């Protein structure tokens, strides 16, 4: 498997992650459930922080993803703003973080130096707590999914293992509701 991110022209399904911010008076539960019921939505994950919902999308091609975003997300009542990240390559990680029950989960959006991209992916694949790695934005961003026994455990992974890595420029960590 290549570690250089590329958009596939193979006809294989393509994906995107959308971070959504809901308006102050929006019915969060209604937005969450109505989006989850849409064709092409593979997950709707409530998150804490700058954004309220992390939406995973899949479509047959990038054009259909873009159409979904334009037609369904922009017109969704209660969604104030969003940020889209197209999945260019995904590395599922096997092991304890990917298997079994965990009490805490998080997602992190990392700005990374593209020169060290391959080395970063290799380090993340070996890191305890990382359950999935997604490349986006031409290798300038990596989205990590983590699982652990507590939010503190996940924060410690970031403070002790991720933040000090050469090539990690900025981290935004979002705890998810289990």
What is each model feature region?
Residues 1-178:
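A compositional/biophysical signature of low hydrophobicity enriched in polar/charged and small residues
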């Amino acid at each position: 498997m290549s570690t250089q991110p590329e958009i596939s022209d193979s006809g294989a399904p393509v994906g995107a992650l959308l971070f959504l911010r809901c308006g102050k008076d929006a019915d969060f539960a209604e937005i969450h459930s109505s989006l989850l019921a849409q064709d092409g939505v593979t997950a709707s994950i409530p998150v804490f922080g700058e954004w309220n919902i992390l939406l995973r999308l899949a479509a047959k091609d990038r054009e259909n993803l873009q159409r979904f975003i334009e037609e369904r997300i922009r017109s969704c009542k209660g969604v104030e703003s969003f940020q889209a990240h197209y999945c260019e390559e995904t590395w599922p990680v096997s092991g304890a973080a990917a298997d079994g029950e965990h009490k805490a989960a998080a997602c992190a959006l990392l700005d990374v130096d593209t020169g060290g991209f391959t080395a970063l992916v290799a380090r993340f694949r070996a890191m305890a707590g990382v359950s999935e790695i997604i490349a986006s934005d031409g290798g300038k961003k990596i989205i990590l999914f983590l699982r652990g026994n507590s939010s503190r455990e996940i924060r410690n992974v970031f403070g002790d293992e991720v933040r000090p890595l050469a090539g990690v420029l900025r981290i935004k960590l979002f705890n998810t509701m289990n």
